[in-house]
Amino acid sequence: MGNINNSEAYVSFQNVQKTYDGESFVIKNLNLDAERGEFLTMLGPSGSGKTTCLLMLAGFETATYGEIVLDGTSINNVPPHKRNIGMVFQNYALFPHLTVNENLAFPLQVRKMAKNEIEDRVKNALEMVQLGDFGSRRPMQLSGGQQQRVAVARALVFEPKIVLMDEPLGALDKHLREQMQYEIKELHEKLEVTIVYVTHDQSEALTMSNRIAVFDDGVIQQLAAPNVLYEAPENAFVAQFIGENNTLSGKVTDIDKEICTVEVGDGKESLRALVVNIDGIGSNTMISLRPERVVVNPESGSYPNVVSAEVIELIYLGDHIRSRMKVCGHDDFIVKIPNSAHHAQLQPGNSVKVGWMAEDARALDALEST
């Protein structure tokens, strides 16, 4: 799945399993490595195991089996306060009775640093998050975004080996959340600190990460760079979870090297798709196709897949039109159409042709409902 070599790993989960009741496992034989300076995101729905992994790395949960290694040393039996790990939570966890300066000074005082060094580090950390003039304020006198910047600065001020972030932007509004994504990414690139980030928000993961581990049911479904996850999902779960996606269920009738033929719509249409994760001829499959890969009324002979479609809904979004169509019996087929004069006359109820390349359609494992 793109794991780095263990000899290069800065953080390493080695055959880690976790159970709370001794029977059902919330983490199942996890092997995951992160490089020094990497921004690695654990992405998945609620209950997928991503937060449990983060808590085990932080020391707030213990692995039932397996080993967790940080900078070449096993930390299974190292208490949280001795792991030299910074943490940023969704609820900020700032001390309300202390000023911003005092909040940042606290982890340094615990480490018994000299007063002048504490003052220098606090000053530098606040300037780093553009809050140099806010040191005398208390958390309640700050906006949500400012509080989150303070939380990030506090996690970095003692120069930890690694920073863990658990849904840190979940409490912010959409605009501020997007702004903080870029600020955290910029800080990471500037400081080259190792960050392990947990979220269920795919846009956060795609925006900030070097690599993303997609979790489901305690198992990593795919580990890859953001563009690879989006363009080349390895299974149906990843295809559905990352980005907007059209799915067409069918049966494989032929395989020719890297391209297979799939019957869909009760055998009324035969489509060609890239072989990715199928069980062979006669097996059920799910074709995954991104909306932006579909062309409306393509030129004759230009696409191997061309089918009839009925326009159901059109939504104007400025630079493009989002159209919901009925295709191969599915009335939730989405097409992103460039906003041009050529397509300006489309109306609900229109009959059109839609086409796409075989390489843009990925034949994956069938969903459980098929």
Indicate residue ranges for each PLM-predicted region.
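ABC ATPase nucleotide-binding domain
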Residues: 12, 33, 69, 353-355
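The feature captures the beta-strand-to-loop junction immediately N-terminal to the Walker
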Residues: 43-45
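Helix-to-loop junction immediately C-terminal to a conserved catalytic motif
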Residues: 58
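Conserved coupling/switch loops of ABC nucleotide-binding domains, chiefly the family-specific signature
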Residues: 64-67, 117, 217, 249
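Conserved ABC transporter NBD signature motif
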Residues: 66-74
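ABC ATPase nucleotide-binding domains
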Residues: 80-86, 90, 94-240
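Non-catalytic connector elements of ABC transporters
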Residues: 245, 254-370
